[in-house]
Structure formats: structure tokens, C-alpha cells
Amino acid sequence: MKYDTVIIGAGMSGLSAGVRLAYYEKKVCILERHTTIGGLNSFYRLRKRNYDVGLHAITNYAEPGTKQGPLSKLLRQLRMTWEDFDLRPQLRSSIVFPDCRLHFTNQFSVFVDQVAAAFPSQIDGFRRLVQRIAEHDALNLERQVVSARQVVSEYIRDPLLVDMIFCPLMFYGSATPRDMDFSQFVIMFKSIFHEGFGRPFEGIRLILKKLVRHFRSLGGDLRLRAGVREIRHTSGRATSVTLDDGTEIEADNILSSAGAAETLRMISPGSPPVKAEPGDISFVESISVLDCAPADLGHRDTIVFYSDSPAFHYERPSEPVDLRSGIICSPNNFDYSEPLEDGRIRITALANPHHWMNLPDDQYVAEKDHWNDRIIDSAVKHIPEFRSHVIDTDVFTPRTIRRFTGHLNGCVYGAPEKFVNGQTPLSNLFLCGTDQGFLGIVGAMLSGITIANRHLLK
């Protein structure tokens, strides 16, 4: 069978592109190597409990019925409703550095007031930076790369405030160490500080299942356990894909969410040479299940971004895990109408992917246990001690990410160099997802939609 478009990967970007194309009656097939959907944002069941992977919160929160903003645009493009996502807002989050704490909510004025109180000498420059952000066209697909640190330092002179602003933005959306492209900085600043966090009561599985159901209702074909081994081409155009089992599927266009380096490795011999280095920003995450709600222990923040050093370090650590900084997320601390079934504390820290990939199997589990203990030791400097209430634990590493997503190095935010317009050396092979450049859950979905609109609905 020949399709109008074959999509590689059933993550957020691939599913969203599939829905957009199928709505316009394109014949679309989504191919997913793994046994479940979601890619970097997925879910699993372990010891009779449900776990989310990837999702701490959905950024770009907006109240139902809002006409402006990325989330409203996303729902319109997918022909979905606010009820399909069922987002509940965060309560409050914090950025914690030595001797300084900034709170923020989904009301941007709260963050502005916090900056003014903690950094009175910097507030005028901060307001000018906010104006610069408002005027910047971050979604221009032909944009040039500009250092965000260079731009921000033109407005803010205090390095502590600079690092406190960068900390959540980098943790939730930077593929590059130590700095960000200014356009990506603008996207993340707006999505986290201007709009804020939300989460479905049922977690990421709700959104994924709604997308799949919508895609199939429009006539789309979704195949699991259908990994792509090779992209065949002739005269500069992709002609078909070959699956791991040898099946060949023809298509007029191919859209890949597998990553730039991963996709270009699939192109059969004789393809035009192009450089695509995989990223190496990856994480270890500790997930603790509690016998009580975190609020019962005095922890009410939704997310805490912390650094124990006045200078924030965002890069691949030389140690297996960077214990100097991290993210503490409690899925319980959103404004739900009823409590979750159990308490959760998720702690995420930068990790060295090469260490975790190369561990012998007989050392891997012990190493996970060791670093889980050390990660929690670091986290309880910033939240109440909770270990006596832990009833179950799971830990994932860059090795886990590599196994279940196929992303080289277990990288979460893709390659440092993005293919912003989605074009590859083959005229009808396009990229969406992390290596196109829109990151996060809403960003990934908009990436799929944007590339579908630009290249596949002509």
C-alpha cells in the first residue's frame, strides 16, 4: 500500500502531525518501533501502579475558552476540545538558589513582584527584557541562532538573577550546554513564566489516548512494533521505508520524529552527506511513591528548580549524576477537584549518558540504587524529609531513555543544532519533534502541526 505520508514515531509530534494530515483526508501511516505510544512522554504500569515518563507538567497553560496562545492554537489545529486535555493549573512553583528563592504561579505578575522584591536594582532591566521577549518572533522557521545569555546580559547585570531565570528554562527545554538559542529562550520564558504549568488528572495517558482515538477516527493507520530500518531514495527523493521485518511501505512524503542523527542513519547508502551530531543532555529521574500526599508533610510546591551552587551548571556532568542541581516535581500539587490515588515525588538531575550506557548489566541495578539515594539526599535540602513514607520506587536513566525511545545517548532535547524548517537533504523527507526545535509537550505537538502545514498540506 502507498501512503501520502508515512510518519516515523508515535510521540507527541508524530501523532499531532498525523491528526492534522488525516483531518484533511490524507492517507497517513504512523510507524512506531516500540510496543506503546508516546516516545519521550509516555506511561507504563509497574507493580500495579501507573507511572508517567517525561511529563512533569504541560507548559503554556491557559484557562479553558482562552482564544489566544499556543494551547488554544493547538486545540484549534487538531480540532480537539479543552475537555480532551482536562488540564488543572499548578499551585505554585519555586526557583531555589543559595540565599535566594523566587516563587511563580500561572500569573506572571507574581514572578515580576518576586524579582522586584529580591533584585530591586535589576527590575528595570528585567522589565525591558520582558518587552524584548514580547517583540521577538521566536516561531520564525528561518530564524538565526543568537546566544540567549548574551542578549539577557544586556538587560540584567546580576549573574545570580540571570542563572535563576535560566535554570527552569534550560531544565525544561535546552539541548545545548550552558546557553540557549534566544528564540528557544523566548519560547520557554513565555511558556513557563507567562503561561505556566498544568496537568491532566489522569496524566499523559489521557492526552495520548485522545490523540490516538482521534487519529484513527479520521482514518489514520497506526502500527506498533513497526520499526523503520531504512529510508530508501532515488534522485534526491525518499521513495519508501523498509521495516525491521523487511516489509516495504511506499509514500509520497516521509515525516520523522526519530531525531536528526537517528533519521539520517536510516537513509540508505548513497545519500547526500550531512552532519547531525546527537545531543548528550540527559537525565536520571527518581520516582518515589508515598503513603501520603506531599502536602501532608508540608510540601505544597508543584515544582522546585534548585541549584546548590550560586552559578548554575547545565552541561553533561563528569560524574554519573550532577548532584548540584535538579528538579523536584509533585504531581499531587496541582489544583485537582479530588486527590490522586497516591503521593508522588519525582526528582530529576543531569546525568552522564556514557557512564550509564557502558555499565555492565550486573552493576546497573546497584548503581541505580546508589544514585537514587544520593539524589534524594540532595533534594531533601529543599523539601521536607519523606523517605519514611516511601512505599515504592522506580528510577530511569539515559539507558532507559535509549532503550524505549531509540534516542542516541538517551538525549531528551535532541541535537544542539536544530533543523528549524524541518527540511533534510532529501526533498520529501522532513523532521518534526525535538530536532526540529519546538520542545516540551505543547512544543512537540505544535512542531508536528507546523511541519505538516508547511510541507505536507500543499
Each predicted region: which residue ranges?
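Mid-domain catalytic core of redox enzymes
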Residues: 229-339
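A conserved FAD-binding loop/helix module that cradles the flavin
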Residues: 434-456
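Short beta-strand to alpha-helix junction loop
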Residues: 62, 66, 143-148, 191-213, ...
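A glycine-rich dinucleotide-binding beta-alpha-beta segment and adjacent secondary-structure elements
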Residues: 158, 162-175, 323-328, 381-438
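C-terminal segments that line or cap access tunnels to active or ligand-binding sites in enzymes
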Residues: 292-399
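N-terminal glycine-rich phosphate/pyrophosphate-binding loop and immediately adjacent elements
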Residues: 2-121
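Rossmann-like flavin
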Residues: 97-180
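Helical element adjacent to the flavin cofactor pocket in flavoenzyme catalytic cores
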Residues: 188-238
